[in-house]
From Swiss-Prot:
Subunit structure: Part of the 30S ribosomal subunit.
Keywords: Ribonucleoprotein, Ribosomal protein
Gene3D superfamilies per UniProt: 3.30.390.140
Name assigned to this protein: Probable small ribosomal subunit protein cS23
Listed GO biological process terms: translation
Organism: Prochlorococcus marinus (strain SARG / CCMP1375 / SS120)
Amino acid sequence: MLGAAEVLASATFDADGVPSGHTPKADEGRFLLKILWLPDNVALAVDQIVGGGTSPLTAYFFWPREDAWETLKTELEDKAWITDNERVEVLNKATEVINYWQEEGKGKTLEEAKLKFPEVTFCGTA
């Protein structure tokens, strides 16, 4: 199974800079977990990989301000075209990131989080 980063890395761009290429099929890394890394919160969102680019699939859900994991789970379950394996893969990675942030990540920089989870897209101020 190709990961999201591998799919995006294989994308080609036309003369106008528009990504084109392979849209992954079910269980081929069709989704990209995005994390907003902040000092007092971590937010999670999912993008779908389409035609070599990405398209937002969910809004950002904040932890611990709200139960981001449960909200993300509900959002993914509401999309019947997402396979169980894909949903589990995204939620497992979200669990890893939340646990890391809770246990040791609050004191870690954004760059340290990126190194810990290279397959996840990060942005933020921490």
